[in-house]
């Protein structure tokens, strides 16, 4: 999603620590899952309440990864944040302490169960 460049000194430290950059030499599809998080309309759709414009840029990559994962037999898991009206899934501490009241209300409404903004972005190959 973001253009990230690891400085060479960090890469060198990884190599010193484990002898290589990559953690795994290969992945066993039977024991592997691609987990896709926060690709809901609330974050991805143009003009959405919680829009992250660069999220749309990674949709083609996600679709390629999901196709490759399915082709090899790896699981594909889609994670949606859903905010309930009450109870532990209302994220009350989060909304009361990290947002102004109006921003909290917008966040809660955008991620409410059954809303279009809570649905996964339509251009994803689900």
PLM feature spans:
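Active-site acidic carboxylates
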Residues: 1-123
